[in-house]
């Protein structure tokens, strides 16, 4: 078993994307490779074909590796639902809510489960690409950190250290990280990868020499900043995303606003909208007049009742009511769907203190949060026009309709099993709708229907979505700037 670990000098340095590229590079070489991340902290999750919840990044990496995603690829998933707490998903199933103090007070049970999953993956595949978490040198948590060097040790994996030059301070990132690590951890780092370089790489040759001389570790590559692929991000809305942009929406484009909740989840639902020609997508946190926007989307949330109270405090409720009266389209996905209804009840304290919170009353539905989470990949058709739709469901709520509304989707399969069910509702004028389907905008016919609600002159672009080619494009880009011969020698050593 030959493994490779990809660690970072900090969060958001590009570990997930580099790991994704390596999964595809190794798969293209005919290697049976799979991704692994012992613990992920993210509200951006996905559902495996057998109905387990893992981080979205590991779903993407499994696709790049051409293997079926499983719960073992991300055995511990922390989904923040307050500023200091999170829901713990263990090997694909939600098991508890924990404060940060409680969780980190004793990580041994979580580590044992993670290493159990690691052993199963090692038995099932020839190679693992192991992604670390955050900075691999958080010394205040080092003795409790089982995601980075303890996992690398358990898998006997050499480590590539990824640093982000785009944010500045790359020398301090690398040399500082290496200098604080204990000798046995430093000895496991076999190479450095400088990520997101802009400009003429030849001008960084002195920088490479400086890094190698002062860290004692070879630089395996300098990867230029690259926008030529569309791959889901891991944790939160990417740092380069502008929230509350200045200026007004472009009158020459279809303009869509996504409300940026404090506990926003599954923001990758909207990546496909951003890539559409003639469409602009803005994330809005602070309440503002919605003039110039054709649609507003309420995304998923890991704390629906808390986020709807925040929405009211920010002044969004009256803005949305005005937008509705003026004929704007309002959509809700998962938690956003629940918010559009009349009420959200939490009798079991799933998201915190038990209670009931009034919704926005834009759809005649009511939601009750349950103790068991619904996890499935689903397919169906739009009610009325038969357009094919697909998505994945991750929710604690059960939502029922108590008034005059049209069904949105007829669900035909869940996790590959035939069903006869309905999901979502919309108003009779089709201006307000909600669904539990994450990823539904990835369904072309539904996406085109949505755009036609916003602009009668909309015509679909000729660009086709090809995720597999995106992975190949990413792999080619990284491989072109990485010393693969040296990397393979490190792995085989």
From Swiss-Prot:
Pathway of action: Cofactor biosynthesis; adenosylcobalamin biosynthesis
Entry protein name: Cobyric acid synthase
Protein family per UniProt: Belongs to the CobB/CobQ family. CobQ subfamily.
Native source species: Prosthecochloris aestuarii (strain DSM 271 / SK 413)
Molecular function terms from GO: ABC-type vitamin B12 transporter activity; catalytic activity
SUPFAM superfamilies reported for this sequence: Class I glutamine amidotransferase-like, P-loop containing nucleoside triphosphate hydrolases
NCBIfam families from the UniProt entry: cobQ (TIGR00313), PRK00784.1 (NF001989)
Entry-linked CDD domains: CobQ_N, GATase1_CobQ
